[in-house]
Amino acid sequence: MIRFNSDYTEGCHTAILEKLVETNMEQTAGYGEDEYCGQARELIRKACGDERVDVHFLVGGTQTNVTVISAALKHYQGVITAKTGHINIHETGALEACGHKCLCIETPDGKLTARQIAAYTDAHFADESFEHMVQPKMVYISNPTEIGTIYKKAELEAIYQVCKKRGLYLFMDGARLGYGLMCKENDLTLSDITANTDVFYIGGTKVGALFGEAVVIRNEELKKDFRYNIKQRGGMLAKGRLLGIQFLTLFEENRYFDISAHAARLAEKLKDELTKMGVKFYIDSPTNQQFPILPDAVLAELKKKYSFAYQERMDETHSAVRFCTCWATKEENVDMGSEEHTSELQSPMYLVC
């Protein structure tokens, strides 16, 4: 079985595993206060182009989102998000469980715009009964989005300016950030993201680590007592050096960016080969998530050899599905022009669809 259903089906990059074994019997301080976390923080600060940012290591994406958002908001405040945002659809109501509402906006491509954010916020405060409604205080975006689209530099800058003008915090979920940064259409750098958000995180779980995310905080208001929130929300690891070692290894020798570029390249190859076969796509994604629309009969055949995620039924006989490449994907697994793959994709039942 070849798994394309997510980008965390393998363990971790070999260099990380080797470093974990090498340091296994060392004694270090706990809870992220060890030398490896310190070294990793310095490498991340350098990559972000800002020595003033705080860097914290948390165990996973949901814990990170809940910790960041709950640390920033008062109990009567909520967070603006695309309706397809991860915090709204894929975190089991974790944010609502700690008392904060997702204020959802419909989007055609998973991306919020500066105009939408301004309109939503202005409409809230224009209502005479605004104090009877949840107050928008933070904007949540993810890059890439849940459907693989990315924010361009001009879009992010415009969103951040709207947020600053209206007193909103801007938070970027970067669970797949490496894959967004290294795709061909991207024009953002880590420095750009640092300068145009209040807080964001660099995903490790989906980009070569066993587990873990690195939160980068630029806004001084959000730095105070953040570690209290990490502990309270279940994101703090006693053996914190396991996180530090992983991010130290990822940010050495350009490794994080190189392995992300590998995934982006193979996703582009997969997309190109399917396009040549006449396959249409649910969305034009430049990143490691691709969403082909295929006949259900073809999908039934593909399931015998491959796993992938269901996205949406398009009509009575076709469905959109998600294929993810990752840092560990093998070249031959995305070679849809090979004899092994064309037997399923170029069958008569496909060609007449």
Question: Model segments located where?
Answer:
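Conserved N-terminal alpha-helix of the aminotransferase class I/II PLP-enzyme fold
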Residues: T14-G61, K83-N88, A94
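Conserved PLP-anchoring active-site segment centered on the Schiff-base-forming lysine
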Residues: A71-I89, A118
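Conserved C-terminal alpha-helix-loop-beta "cap" of PLP-dependent enzymes
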Residues: H75-Y76, E268-E339
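PLP-dependent aminotransferase-class I/II
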Residues: G99-K137, I141-P144, Y151-A158
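Active-site C-terminal subdomain of aminotransferase-like
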Residues: P108, Q135-P136, S142, I150, ...
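Catalytic PLP-binding core of fold-type I/II PLP enzymes
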Residues: Y151-C183
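Single conserved hydrophobic/aromatic residue that forms the stacking wall/gate
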Residues: E340-C353
